[in-house]
Amino acid sequence: MPKEQNLDIERKQEHIEINLKQNVNSTLKSGLESIKFIHNALPEINYDSIDTTTTFLGKDMKAPILISSMTGGTARARDINYRLAQAAQKSGIAMGLGSMRILLTKPDTIKTFTVRHVAPDIPLLANIGAVQLNYGVTPKECQYLIDTIKADALILHLNVLHELTQPEGNKNWENLLPKIKEVINYLSVPVIVKEVGYGLSKQVAKKLIKAGVKVLDIAGSGGTSWSQVEAYRAKNSMQNRIASSFINWGITTLDSLKMLQEISKDITIIASGGLQSGIDGAKAIRMGANIFGLAGKLLKAADIAESLVLEEIQVIIEQLKITMLCTGSCTLKDLAKAEIMW
């Protein structure tokens, strides 16, 4: 096996291990904690009539939840992805896969990503770093990733800070937008552009929408800090000092949502980054999101058992439904207009 492929697998293994064992959270909070719903003591709604259903990528979902992209490429990642996918299928929610670049150079990693057979009905998202378009990945190869796992969309993730704090990271980020547009025009499915924990600004969102992007995952600061993950991976003190200095970098999830409010009418917004509960998810929907994503706590559960993932998802859904009832919101559209205070 070429040395570069070995390094890719080693890096993915280290990422899982560090995320499970170390505190890699940003020192920033998501900002959602500053929002308070106005409690409705007389909601006049039957709990059984609360409707959390929605549609995403043409598929029905029982709740507006995305299992955010995490991993792939290793045996441990295969088990994690299978458990996440099975739980997503049973819960009626969406799932994103981790970066699939390794599949283009190491085809035998395919089993770590192919989960459609255990999750036939869910919105399933393929995933690759957008910067890879500057390093030889073609629109045709992006379509190959989609076809291989029977995905409903392709995530192009923007992870500039993560790449720059990796010793082996990709540093050429020029002229990327035209290449993203090429992929959008070539593919048979929609493209989702996603940050990885540092937020999307209004200016960047406008550029992406103009290029044809219909779904944005803001992935704001407040959750996992990938620069902090790289600080733990650092092989020397200099690398550690550089990476760890960015632990409070980024646009918080709430600030990113507020920036995108006036331009989000015709696109789908996924809110992720530091969300910890269905209450946080409800706040994100109130601030303009259509769907909310979580990763960290589901990763920890999926490393152990599918039943724990199912339990976490059920807790999140129940928190969402209780929040809806306590704000007098029968549907997600009602929740998006619920009274709040700061």
UniProtKB/Swiss-Prot annotation:
Signal peptide: none annotated. CDD domains: IDI-2_FMN (cd02811). GO terms for cellular component: cytoplasm. Its cofactor is FMN; NADPH; Mg(2+). Mg(2+) binds at E163. Its EC number is 5.3.3.2. Substrate binds at R11, K12, S99, M100, R101. It catalyses: isopentenyl diphosphate = dimethylallyl diphosphate. Gene3D superfamilies: Aldolase class I. Transmembrane segments: none annotated. Involved in the biosynthesis of isoprenoids. Catalyzes the 1,3-allylic rearrangement of the homoallylic substrate isopentenyl (IPP) to its allylic isomer, dimethylallyl diphosphate (DMAPP). Belongs to the IPP isomerase type 2 family. Homooctamer. Dimer of tetramers. This is Isopentenyl-diphosphate delta-isomerase.
